[in-house]
Amino acid sequence: MDWRVLIVLAPVIIAGSWALFNIGAAAIRQVQEFLNRDKLA
């Protein structure tokens, strides 16, 4: 694989993984809030 391809793809992969990480963290937070609300009711 050409090094130029890596230079082009690296920022895209980093941004994609960062977005997935943030979405996953937000989803876990929402699930935890939902479970906590379920216990309080």
Swiss-Prot record:
It comes from Gloeothece citriformis (strain PCC 7424) (Cyanothece sp. (strain PCC 7424)). Pfam families: PsbY. It is a single-pass membrane protein. The lineage of its organism: Bacteria, Bacillati, Cyanobacteriota, Cyanophyceae, Oscillatoriophycideae. The keyword Cell inner membrane does not apply. Coiled coil: none annotated. Loosely associated component of the core of photosystem II (PSII), it is not always seen in crystals. PSII is a light-driven water plastoquinone oxidoreductase, using light energy to abstract electrons from H(2)O, generating a proton gradient subsequently used for ATP formation. It is found in: Cellular thylakoid membrane. Keywords: Membrane, Photosynthesis, Photosystem II, Thylakoid, Transmembrane, Transmembrane helix. This is Photosystem II reaction center protein Y. PSII is composed of 1 copy each of membrane proteins PsbA, PsbB, PsbC, PsbD, PsbE, PsbF, PsbH, PsbI, PsbJ, PsbK, PsbL, PsbM, PsbT, PsbX, PsbY, PsbZ, Psb30/Ycf12, peripheral proteins PsbO, CyanoQ (PsbQ), PsbU, PsbV and a large number of cofactors. It forms dimeric complexes. The keyword Membrane applies. The chain crosses the membrane at residues 5-23. InterPro entries: PSII_PsbY. GO terms for molecular function: manganese ion binding. One of its GO terms (cellular component) is plasma membrane-derived thylakoid membrane.
